[in-house]
UniProtKB/Swiss-Prot annotation:
SS bond partners: none
Gene Ontology process terms (BP): phosphatidylglycerol metabolic process; unsaturated fatty acid biosynthetic process
Identification of the protein by name: Fatty acid desaturase 4, chloroplastic
Gene of this entry: FAD4
Species per Swiss-Prot/TrEMBL record: Arabidopsis thaliana (Mouse-ear cress)
Function of the molecule: Fatty acid desaturase involved in the production of chloroplast-specific phosphatidylglycerol molecular species containing 16:1(3E). Catalyzes the formation of a trans double bond introduced close to the carboxyl group of palmitic acid, which is specifically esterified to the sn-2 glyceryl carbon of phosphatidylglycerol.
Length: 323
């Protein structure tokens, strides 16, 4: 008697496919850099971002496992350009336009100082202009911190008026050592323009010595804040002894204090004149409160809330010199 084929060899659903045979793509974050002996102004970096992608499986229930499956990940490659300035980069050099703007800013400061000193002697006022100057010094440090926090956390290079400064400060987080390579006028000319257009009308409109005591000191600290910032990135052996002494006394922001700003989570020590306000602002969480207000009122998240990415992670000067 013949046995039918289906009866002798019954068909069964496949239920024991090993997990290793199931399709799964793994995607990780990889940073690759290529160095050569020739200068390359536009070095490309390969950035790989990690994302979770659910791959579709067959609807056949016989192919489904009752055990929970781990998230499958996919490899996606995103290419970006990264070009840290070289030590001899022309963008770090001062031009005559830069020097003229710094000279104009310093001239407006000198006029304001002269009006304060001469007006104080003529009015027999010495203490009041001095106290006003001290107030200007203290508030300049606060102002530098608020502005630094704002451009670190909000806006981008397309932001009107301050877009270039936002882009520059983001680059500064990635290559902080470049500020020590900038020439004096190159580092100060942008602030010198602001000071010139702000202080010049005040010089022409007011003669009060107390008022100018505040204006000249506040404007001086704002104009030279970027130089104080550069000194905070310098090494002690290469700084003028007077600068080191002022840093040690707390009159200028110290190297150790500002170094904390360039460490994760990158959300503290924003003030760059004397740094006197840093502890007050950080311990009272003023900036965190402002960030919450902006988020709930405007729906805007600050950059400090995100995990540090390649735009925040510092690259050393050594890797730049090898490129």
């Amino acid at each position: 008697m013949a046995v039918s084929l289906p009866t002798k060899y019954p068909l069964r659903p496949i239920t024991n496919i090993p997990k290793s045979h199931r399709p799964s793509l793994l995607r990780v974050r990889v940073t690759c850099s290529v160095t050569t002996t020739k200068p390359q102004p536009n070095r490309e970096k390969l950035l790989v971002e990690q994302r979770t992608v659910n791959l579709p499986l067959s609807n056949d229930q016989s192919l489904q496992s009752t055990k929970p499956r781990p998230n499958r990940e996919k490899l996606v490659v995103e290419q970006r350009l990264a070009s840290p300035p070289l030590s001899n980069d022309p963008t770090l050099k001062s031009t005559w336009t830069h020097r003229l703007w710094v000279a104009a800013g310093c001239t407006t400061l000198f006029v304001s100082l002269a009006k304060s000193v001469i007006g104080g002697f003529d009015s027999h006022l010495c203490l009041e202009p001095a106290l006003a100057g001290y107030a200007g010094y203290i508030l300049a440090d606060l102002g530098s911190g608020v502005y630094h926090w704002a451009i670190d956390n909000y806006g981008d290079e397309s932001t009107p008026v301050v877009g270039t400064q936002i882009e520059a400060f983001q680059g500064h987080h990635k290559w902080p050592w470049t500020i020590t390579r900038r020439q004096f006028a190159n580092n100060l000319h942008a602030l010198a323009q602001v000071i010139t257009f702000t202080v010049l009308p005040l010089d022409l409109a007011f003669n009060d010595p107390v008022f100018h005591g505040f204006v000249c000191t506040f404007a001086f600290c704002i104009l030279f804040s970027q130089q104080f910032h550069a000194w905070a990135h310098g090494t002690k052996s290469k700084l003028p002894p007077l600068v080191v002494a002022l840093q040690d006394m707390g009159l200028l922001v110290s190297r150790r204090q500002h170094a904390e700003h360039h460490r994760a989570p990158y959300n503290n020590n924003y003030c760059i004149v004397s740094g006197a306000w840093n502890n007050v602002l950080d311990e009272s969480k003023v900036f965190e409160a402002l960030e919450m207000v902006f988020y709930f009122q405007l729906g805007v998240r600050p950059r400090s809330w995100s995990e540090p990415n390649s735009d925040w992670i510092e690259e050393t000067e050594i890797s730049n010199n090898q490129a």
